[in-house]
């Protein structure tokens, strides 16, 4: 297998793992402002612990792949001197923070986190791990204040995207569980969670758009936009923006049509059809989110402008 292809695969896995590891507990333990948040967080704890350990393995593989790419030889994957050389780069320094944060999350999730400060620590560590991925992107090609601005925008973009994806994953799980149990109380909890996420979701989406716009401007600039469209980077970026716009449309559909329809159906005792529509919409949004992550994994490895 080509090292570049393996690098894209590792990046994709890390994006999925770290987005879920940060976003799901953020939603369940913080954004879900109700008495249900502890129960929802606890229902995910074992899964999140598994994801934390899986992310450690993926991150370790990522370091070896980076060593292979730097050396141009597969035996660099386990060469101590080459691995230490990678760790000495900005990418490697971020990798150390990522690994330390992931170990912290994995250890914390060994026990139930019933108090808000405990959950906040786990969420913060997961956020550090997710934000550290910014040091594997285009920002490192810049120097001085420009690099700092780009890295800040990258970190905000990653955290906001992780919060949105985690919320989608958690909400889909709540709706699927409610549909399976057919329990009216479970369905009402899911409906409340969907309705209550509206304000937070708006802030998250605004952050994604603003930080993404800053990133785009710093990578290609206004002058380079036309040239970038003619490159594979530009084509994939347009595809990402299209999928993102569809996700926005689905989020609006859920908020303004499907959730109110479910609430009305609950009061009338006719919930199955409304719940099915909402479940399918969230599933589609879920799939689109992972498609966007796949595109992001590739975009970070491509040159944005023609050579």
Annotate each predicted stretch with a short phrase:
Residues 1-307:
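Polytopic transmembrane helical bundles with strong interfacial aromatic enrichment
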């Amino acid at each position: 297998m080509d090292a570049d292809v393996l690098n894209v695969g590792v990046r994709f896995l890390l994006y999925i793992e770290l987005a879920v590891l940060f976003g799901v507990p953020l939603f369940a333990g913080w954004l879900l402002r109700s008495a249900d948040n502890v129960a929802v967080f606890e229902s995910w704890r074992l899964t999140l612990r598994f994801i934390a350990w899986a992310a450690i393995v993926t991150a370790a593989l990522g370091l070896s792949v980076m060593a292979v790419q730097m050396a141009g030889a597969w035996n660099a994957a386990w060469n101590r001197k080459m691995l230490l050389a990678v760790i000495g780069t900005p990418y490697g320094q971020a990798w150390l923070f990522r690994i330390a944060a992931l170990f912290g999350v994995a250890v914390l999730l060994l026990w139930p986190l019933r108090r808000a400060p405990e959950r906040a620590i786990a969420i913060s560590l997961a956020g550090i791990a997710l934000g550290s991925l910014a040091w594997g992107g285009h920002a490192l090609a810049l120097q001085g204040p420009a690099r700092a601005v780009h890295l800040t925008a990258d970190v905000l973009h990653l955290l906001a995207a992780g919060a949105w994806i985690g919320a989608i994953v958690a909400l889909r799980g709540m709706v699927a569980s409610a549909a399976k149990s057919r329990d009216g109380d479970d369905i009402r909890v899911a409906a409340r969670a969907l309705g209550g996420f509206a304000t937070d979701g708006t802030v998250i989406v605004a952050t994604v758009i603003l930080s993404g716009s800053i990133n785009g401007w710093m990578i290609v600039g206004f002058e380079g936009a036309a040239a970038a469209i003619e490159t594979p980077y530009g084509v994939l970026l347009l595809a990402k923006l299209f999928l993102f716009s569809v996700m926005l449309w689905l989020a609006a559909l859920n908020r303004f049509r499907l959730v109110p329809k479910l609430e009305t159906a609950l009061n009338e005792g006719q919930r199955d059809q409304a719940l099915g529509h909402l479940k399918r919409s969230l599933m589609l949004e879920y799939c689109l989110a992972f498609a966007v992550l796949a595109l992001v994994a590739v975009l970070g490895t491509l040159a944005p402008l023609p050579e």
